[in-house]
Amino acid sequence: MGLSDGEWQLVLNIWGKVETDLAGHGQEVLIRLFKNHPETLDKFDKFKHLKTEDEMKGSEDLKKHGNTVLTALGGILKKKGHHEAELKPLAQSHATKHKIPVKYLEFISDAIIQVLQSKHSGDFHADTEAAMKKALELFRNDIAAKYKELGFQG
């Protein structure tokens, strides 16, 4: 299920555009996640009080967390599938501390794709989208495997 060198290059090229504004992209990803799947907000005590999109857009904490999420994901993507060292602590915290189900990782993956389509439509062609979906699926599958090792049924 690995990606070819060409697919990784497509992923990293579009990710370079994300990195010009990690906080803005991250905030938009989280807003889409919470709008499309309001149940995910329950996992974020810090953001439960944010009820409207305007409140979410005005939240510096949400922007900061979006930056954290996409910084971590970028570090994983840059490893081109050789992300064991980066993935292990992430899986550990998401399984034991935050208790984030794999399903929610699917939801945020969808939100990432939507944000890329929206913000980078001129560069996010079908082949790039397919490569990014494949990279995110690889990430989710590897997280799910770590969850299983940790005994988390998420």
Curated annotation (Swiss-Prot):
Binding, O2: 65
Highest taxon of the lineage: Eukaryota
Subcellular location: Cytoplasm, Sarcoplasm
Modification Phosphoserine occurs at: 4
Domain Globin intervals: 2-148
PTM sites of type Phosphothreonine: 68
Binding residues for heme b: 94
Main location: cytoplasm
First-tier enzyme category under EC: oxidoreductase
One GO CC term, this protein: sarcoplasm
Entry binding sites for nitrite: 65
Gene Ontology biological-process entries: removal of superoxide radicals
EC number: 1.7.-.-, 1.11.1.-
Catalytic activity: Fe(III)-heme b-[protein] + nitric oxide + H2O = Fe(II)-heme b-[protein] + nitrite + 2 H(+); H2O2 + AH2 = A + 2 H2O
Alphabetic keyword roster: Cytoplasm, Heme, Iron, Metal-binding, Muscle protein, Oxidoreductase, Oxygen transport, Phosphoprotein, Transport
UniProt GO MF annotations: heme binding; metal ion binding; nitrite reductase activity; oxygen binding; oxygen carrier activity; peroxidase activity
Subunit composition and interactions: Monomeric.
Family: Belongs to the globin family.
The name this protein goes by in its record: Myoglobin
Organism: Vulpes chama
